[in-house]
UniProtKB/Swiss-Prot annotation:
Organism: Arabidopsis thaliana
Domain of life from the UniProt record: Eukaryota
Key words, A-Z: Repeat, Secreted, Signal
Residues making up the signal peptide according to the UniProt record: 1-32
Subcellular localization(s) per the UniProt record: Secreted
Residue stretches making up the Gnk2-homologous domain: 39-147, 160-267
Protein name per its UniProtKB record: Putative cysteine-rich repeat secretory protein 19
Length: 278
């Protein structure tokens, strides 16, 4: 981390068995996609200082996290995959933001937010007024400031694959092309899960066949960003971390405001509404 005859009959059957076995494994792998929710990274931010044990700030933080366990308390947020809650006034204001991966909306989103929230509050960054944690399916941020709508250029990290690309098997241009196409879809496709509001989903996933291989990708921006903000965020992080991923078979780049991933294997179910085969 930086801060893809009877003898002849037997010979005919062998490749058939191999193909069928491979297909069964692929079906099983695809059907199990998005079932994991691994911890990825966290950051305790020192700028906003720490709160005192037993303080009003801590109580507000506890109350908000506990409310996430009640599905009726924030059902809209879990259904849409995003929420920003702010309580009190500065310097005692408590702001909690969560963003779930679009294909993890609903119960998966709630489960991830509850797990990540308690992990951040109790284990990773106790007493910090500002902290952020990333899981496979969501991110959760605590803060004493309201930064909604702003691109965060400070809290980010790059997780490249351990495997390098061989030669020019998948060129830099091909990977950039996929990420750019996904970003265009993300900022133009309307979110079908928000009733009465025509808002871009700011998420897209898909795959591109390149010779004998396929390249899989995903992009997402935080729901509080504008279309312009999403475009700017994606461009910034693609360029900012290019040295981290340009020679790698896969990568995850995550920030508070946007993230992207590409791999030489499928990592998101192709059955979703926002999945495209180019």
């Amino acid at each position: 981390m930086y801060s893809s005859s009877s003898v002849s009959k037997r010979f005919v059957l062998v490749p058939i068995v191999v193909v069928v076995t491979t297909q069964l494994l692929l079906v099983r792998n695809v059907s199990s996609l998005n079932l994991t929710n691994s911890y990825l990274h966290h950051k305790c931010v020192v700028n906003q200082g720490k709160y005192k044990p037993g303080s009003k700030y801590e109580k507000s933080l506890d109350d908000i996290i506990q409310s996430f366990s009640n599905k009726d308390k924030d059902s809209y947020g879990f259904r849409t995959g995003y929420s920003m809650k702010a309580y009190g006034k500065e310097p005692d204001m408590v702001s909690i933001t969560y963003q779930c991966r679009i294909d993890s909306r609903g119960p998966k989103c709630q489960s991830c937010v509850v797990t990540a929230g308690y992990e951040l509050l109790r284990k990773r960054c106790p007493r910090y007024k500002e902290a952020i944690i990333w899981y496979d399916q969501c991110l959760v941020e605590f803060s004493s400031l309201d930064t909604s709508g702003q691109i965060n250029y400070d809290d980010n990290f790059c997780m490249p694959s351990a495997k390098n690309l061989i030669g020019n098997s998948i060129s830099l241009e091909e990977r950039l092309h996929l990420l750019n196409n996904l970003t265009k879809i993300a900022v133009t496709k309307i979110d079908k899960n928000i009733e009465g509001i025509k808002k871009p989903v700011l998420y897209a996933a898909g795959e591109k066949r390149l010779g004998t291989k396929s390249l899989y990708g995903m992009v997402q921006c935080s729901a509080d960003l504008s279309v312009q903000g999403c475009n700017e965020c994606m461009l910034y992080y693609i360029v900012h971390f290019q040295e981290c991923w340009e020679s790698k078979q896969g990568v995850r780049v995550l920030s508070r405001s946007c993230n992207f991933r590409y791999e030489l294997y499928p990592f998101i179910s192709p059955k979703g509404s926002y999945y495209t085969k180019f």
